[in-house]
């Protein structure tokens, strides 16, 4: 921007496909299938809200996000934008949990979570009964405390 500040959200709109929407999160969660995924999604919404105190926002078509931070990709500093601090998606095959391993403290605690697999940017869980909800709450709190990534560009 002309004043030397950066409009991160505008930059993310141009580069990221997963952006906040005005879609109704409750409607989205109640439409999840199968029924087990719907129940787990509703329970996750309760847990995430309880820990963060934030209202959920649907990011893209399927990610329930809480809060946001400004990210800068470590692989390509030109890739930047806004992203939820933490969140989840009740996908048909499994639950996707976001932000839980982004910070060193969370990554160190992750093995205590229970039965899960890892993706590049998320943790996959088959069902909530497979994990320790107290550990999940701690992981959410760690993710929630995250700040913005530093902007590597010199300020004007």
Q: Where are these predicted regions, by residue range?
A:
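Charge-dense, helix-prone N-terminal extensions
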Residues: 1-156
């Amino acid at each position: 921007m002309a004043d030397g500040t950066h409009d991160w959200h505008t930059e993310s709109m141009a580069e990221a496909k997963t952006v906040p929407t005005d879609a109704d999160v409750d409607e989205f969660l109640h439409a999840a299938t199968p029924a087990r995924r719907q129940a787990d999604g509703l329970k996750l919404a309760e847990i995430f809200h309880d820990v963060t105190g934030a209202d959920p926002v649907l990011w893209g078509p399927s990610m329930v996000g809480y809060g946001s931070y400004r990210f800068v990709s470590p692989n390509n500093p030109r890739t930047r934008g806004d992203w939820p601090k933490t969140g989840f998606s009740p996908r048909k095959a499994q639950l996707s949990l976001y932000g839980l391993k982004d910070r060193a403290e969370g990554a160190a605690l992750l093995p205590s979570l229970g039965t899960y697999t890892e993706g590049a940017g998320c943790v996959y869980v088959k069902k909530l009964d497979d994990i320790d909800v107290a550990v999940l709450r701690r992981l959410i709190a760690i993710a929630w405390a995250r700040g913005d990534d530093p902007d590597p560009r010199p300020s004007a």
